[in-house]
Curated annotation (Swiss-Prot):
GO terms for biological process: translation. InterPro entries: Ribosomal_uS11, Ribosomal_uS11_bac-type, Ribosomal_uS11_CS, Ribosomal_uS11_sf. Belongs to the universal ribosomal protein uS11 family. The lineage of its organism: Bacteria, Bacillati, Bacillota, Bacilli, Bacillales. It comes from Brevibacillus brevis (strain 47 / JCM 6285 / NBRC 100599). The gene is rpsK. This is Small ribosomal subunit protein uS11.
Length: 133
């Protein structure tokens, strides 16, 4: 007769409230989606959100409104952790860049600096072929 294995309770890591007043908002805006990650100055993630994670699907993910909603959701969680001011670094060519920055300011976070960190090749890889529609 086989012995029954005792059920072990799965341990879930409880989110502890970090007290971080200054942070960095990394906004990655592509042609398909916008991802907003808010970190502490060392780069440890405090909160994140994206247009896709909020339920936007397909071409709606790439809209400025979806980027605005993603930035608001990430900012709300960051403010619960005590964040007051931000430095914003924006990467990518997408439509949601400015909308995400504006919504971060509208939530009550103080934006100290905005920098564009879009990678620009010094004639590196060959780009994809031109689309013919």
């Amino acid at each position: 007769m086989a012995k029954r294995k005792q059920a072990t309770a799965t341990r879930t890591r409880r989110r502890d409230r970090k007290n971080v007043e200054v942070g960095v908002a990394h906004i990655r805006s592509t042609f398909n989606n916008t991802i907003v990650t808010i970190t502490d100055p060392h780069g440890n993630a405090i909160s994140w959100s994206s247009a896709g994670s909020l339920g936007f699907k397909g071409s709606r993910k790439s809209t400025p409104f979806a980027a605005q909603m993603a930035a608001e959701a990430a900012a709300r969680v960051a403010m619960e952790h005590g964040m007051r001011s931000l430095e914003v670094s924006v990467k990518g060519p997408g439509a949601g860049r400015e909308a995400a920055i504006r919504s971060l300011q509208a939530t009550g976070l103080e934006v100290n600096m905005i920098k564009d960190v879009t990678p620009i090749p010094h004639n590196g890889c060959r780009p994809p072929k031109r689309r013919r529609v």
